[in-house]
């Protein structure tokens, strides 16, 4: 007896063979009430035939490597992932449905045997044999993915959720049902990109935790405090070091949150975050009020013209000064009282109302219709399996896997291997859309292939020729491509992302130079503090270089270049944003890469003016480079005033673009780019005196005093917030460090001082002194804008046994150079252990020694065995020992402790 299922199976195979032989073209799929599938397109060659629901339905999957298993599954129940292919005159049904009455189901419900299908039905063209372009656009195949209901009561079709006109509100993405395969469907008007900004210890990470909890981005069992602070150093120190991007779903909205650091050493992370956001949450500690970093953040937000949501945190504390802080915000920042939110991030109080404000106040990303793919890189890191991972913001278009892209700045081409979102772990997807913050992997293995602020465009739109690189303008295309997710059509004949591109008439022949397509550069801070890093063991020099390369990839403000020291061997001259930044880098090298390091004394960039006629040719060739331009450096006239020039450049000079260790924060270069320029009358801003200039952070590059006409040191605008009762202590400390008073502001019971301070004076322990004299209530921050002022500086040389230790040389002002030199000599005496020979430690300026200390040698009692005899025997032994000590003094080497520089210069992380 032949079973019914065998007959049905044979019938299915017969239908399949018959349909494959008559393969012609794909048509649209819809549901028809109470019946089955049919094709509504006219002229379908007999495809108006309807099939009863109790019939046998078969599923076809294209490109499958496991056809046998899927075939059996399709016969027995359902093939929910298959795509229906209708051919002229015949068609292949999609599902195998059982009799509703035999299954005991309600007649008004239609369910599948097997797992339930939750995705809409899609029909995709195959190998260019699709419908004409006009039919595929809008109401044709895959335009909206809309299905007519198939139930007797107008309900959803069997196994398919109700899908009513899911149009994408983002014309900039040209969204459609087929966007490359798997990107989540969401209107781009529902995307919100924002960051959380605040002074240190104001509760940014705690608020980010509440965001993750309330949006259910992280499961409760995996949740922990400071979840986004994934580095062990961040958890130990209780601070945020790196910006973190995370994607969250809130109702029908997509939140792209960027958690930023609060310490001013990592202010460059804040500036990069602002470049890719449309709004920001300004978080204020309810127990401390407005602090110094709050002022800098507010000014930076105004520069970027971002929407600001003021939020007062920690309202659950008894010491919260809510009314007082509100008054300060109204008077100082000119907020409206109704705009200020009160929350407790610890207990999630008021966070839901903050969500509503984010939705209503922060605008969605700018949308551009019919645009090609373009994105900007604002962060990156290294993965040992995938190589360099780029964190990008998509400015235009859609990006899918296996797409060829072009990097404008580096002029390199690569193929995208993986795209996805940060949730906060990497979650791959099929495509990313306009306005998204996502990651891409291009299988890059070299850390210097792509840099921060790089612009990525689709390779299809770049037309290369022998002389210049031009880009086809795609803003205007013939016809409306509303049904295409991203066709990427160019007049160069490049195929679309999905199938062959239909012929499209271009209404413009305008071509754009490639440089004009580059996005606005992300703010990247240049290092202001420099020091040398050496490995304790020479065998680890290569490992140290590899570690620095990977750290530079993850930290745009960090720079380094090779350097060699006679006493410490091969090393690297590195640039940082402050001593905390230096401390973090050193600790990460030790923990993540297992390399023990020695760090030299920190220094800053100095502008040196030398005598053009007096300097010899050899020294000129070593220091001078024509790439350096003094016009890019803001020099204060006469060493007074703030020296701020409207026309001075905010970027680095031409010579500092290589990321070398001696690059200044604003408009400088170093020994490699330490060039020269003559002061002239047409220099913008305050004109420096005429002469030969170069810039360096290496004190040993400064020649003898008879060659030098002047040394200029960097000054920065410093803001200090303190209670009124401590203001005299603050002013005394600032004047002691050669600060120039600018102005004072009063905010209720607090005072804000503005000083121009020498950068070298505030780097070492200045914040500790501020905290000490204000009993912990004071705070300090400084701007990255640098002004150079001429100062009476002296080069201090440290000698050990008549040998100059280059790594210990430093510059000091004439008011305190003797005090600093004597202090270093005394500390060296305490740190260096006694040797078999005499150790003499000296400090001097030029040929004049002004401080000296001696460490007596270890002596053996050579006369212990002399129990009598002539005195000449005893004297002979002592003279022989003394002669040996003198010989050892001339040829012996003093061992310096590896942690000498940290203790010597009191290098505490600010």
Swiss-Prot record:
InterPro entries: EF-4, EFG_II, EFG_III/V, EFG_V-like, LepA_C_sf, LepA_CTD, LepA_IV, P-loop_NTPase
Molecular-function GO terms, alphabetical: GTP binding; GTPase activity; ribosome binding
One Gene Ontology biological process: translation
Biased composition (Low complexity): 646-667
Alphabetized PROSITE patterns for the sequence: G_TR_2 (PS51722)
More info: This protein may be expected to contain an N-terminal transit peptide but none has been predicted.
Pfam families associated with the record: EFG_C, EFG_III, GTP_EFTU, LepA_C
EC number(s) from the headed UniProt entry: 3.6.5.-
Family to which this protein belongs: Belongs to the TRAFAC class translation factor GTPase superfamily. Classic translation factor GTPase family. LepA subfamily.
Keyword flag GTP-binding: yes
Source organism of this protein record: Plasmodium vivax (strain Salvador I)
Keyword Metal-binding recorded: no
Protein name, UniProt field: Translation factor GUF1 homolog, mitochondrial
